[in-house]
A protein has these predicted regions:
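Rossmann-fold dehydrogenase core element
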Residues: 82-100, 119-126
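Active-site loop of classical SDR/Rossmann-like NAD(P)-dependent oxidoreductases
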Residues: 11, 247, 277-291, 308
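Beta-loop-alpha module in the N-terminal Rossmann-like domain of NAD(P)-dependent dehydrogenases
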Residues: 12, 23-86
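Contiguous beta-strand/loop segments that form the cofactor/metal-binding neighborhood of enzyme cores
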Residues: 162-254, 290-298, 302
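Predominantly a Rossmann-like dinucleotide-binding segment in NAD(P)-dependent oxidoreductases
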Residues: 100-197, 330
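C-terminal helix-rich "cap/oligomerization" subdomain common to oxidoreductases
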Residues: 43-46, 81, 292-338
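N-terminal Rossmann-like dinucleotide-binding module
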Residues: 1-23
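A short helix->loop->beta-strand "cap" motif at the edges of active sites that frequently abuts
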Residues: 25-26, 63-65, 90-92, 214-218
Length: 338
């Protein structure tokens, strides 16, 4: 790929040093400010809790570094808007890590949808099921803390919303959200006692979409859980006037023409995955995304084809904010459009 990791920073310097030793990273810092100011750094990858994203991103952009920011982009749309404004003013590459866009199966799915293979979209359904945080004895961490941006809605719901927007080329106009916290306390590693969990571990979401070239009166639903046992699922379904498309965690893509009553496979090229990464859609998507980022940086471009920009991150954040407001009011909420 022709890229080199030249520096790593962590609040836990000992961990950073261990990673640096394993992968031959020359510069180690206990403060991210050293990293974003380093002369050899071209791209800053922000993989810290969401509450820290805005400060790190703004500083990196001030140093004219390209930025790849983990999702959710920020704690709220106000913070995200500031990040967009700064990125636009500096004119550098600024992306959100929505790597699922780079899976071959999803790219083929989007191409088929846009070519009219299933007609006008009527409904979308997204299912994410994992027991990643299903064990109550798992220690309290930032994922358990609302103030730090933890929770299933931000971590997984952001991917769901981005998938809807990118796949349909439409905006979310209205939402209804129900967030739940099933494991309400977790062990504190410092005190040994139990600490309150202030974030959601399940989300049930409904959506309405704007009309566009592929949508007319379209609706959507999502079921997200990180405390559900059983088979791990990351499944996206789109139902149209002429048929349906479905992509699964495995990368398999299926089509069901209206009236057929069955799914049939769609041939998709296998995704490549970097050595040493854990098997899964996230790793396969990120491998392709990373290659595209490096190619753009080498070419001096400030965009990456198909990648989620800071503007996309802001749009997703508007939807997440509306979903949280809906959960509080138990009512449908309109998403801010500007």
């Amino acid at each position: 790929m022709g890229a080199k990791v030249v520096a790593i920073a962590s609040g836990h310097r000992d961990r950073a040093e261990a990673v640096a030793k394993e992968f031959g990273i020359e510069h180690v810092a206990g403060d991210w400010r050293e990293l974003v100011a380093h002369s050899e750094v071209d791209l800053v990858s922000i993989v810290t809790p969401p509450s820290t994203h805005i400060e790190i991103a703004l500083a990196a952009l001030d140093h004219r570094k390209a930025v790849l920011c983990e999702k959710p982009m920020a704690l709220n749309a106000g913070e995200a808007a500031r990040m967009v404004e700064k990125a636009n003013s500096m004119g550098v590459l600024a992306l959100i890590d929505h790597e699922l866009r780079f899976l071959n199966s999803r790219r083929v799915m989007r191409g088929m949808l846009q070519s009219g293979a299933i007609g006008i979209v009527r409904h979308c359904n997204y299912v994410f099921r994992s027991d990643y945080r299903g064990i109550a004895d798992r220690a309290w961490d930032w994922w358990s803390d609302e103030a730090m941006g933890g929770g299933a809605l931000g971590a997984i719901g952001s991917h769901v919303v981005d998938s809807f927007r990118w796949m349909l080329s439409a905006e979310v106009t209205d939402v209804l959200g129900m967030l739940s916290t099933h494991i309400k306390q977790r062990p504190d590693k410092t005190t040994g006692g139990l600490r309150e969990v202030t974030t959601d571990d399940e989300a049930k979401l409904l959506f309405r979409f704007s009309d566009g070239p592929h949508t007319q009166g379209a609706t959507g639903a999502a079921s997200i859980s990180v405390v559900e046992s059983g088979k791990y699922e990351n499944r996206f379904e789109i139902y149209g006037s002429k048929g349906a498309l479905m992509v699964e965690e495995t990368g398999e893509l299926w089509i069901s023409p209206t009236g057929s009553g069955a799914w049939r496979p769609v041939q998709v090229d296998q995704d490549h995955m970097a050595r040493g990464m854990r098997e899964g859609s996230w790793s396969r998507g990120f491998t392709a995304f990373a290659v595209a980022i490096v190619e753009s940086l080498r070419a001096g471009r400030t965009t990456v084809k198909d990648a989620a920009t800071f503007e996309d991150g802001y749009r997703v954040q508007l939807v997440l904010d509306a979903l949280r407001a809906s959960n509080e009011s138990s009512c449908w909420v309109s998403v801010k459009q500007d």
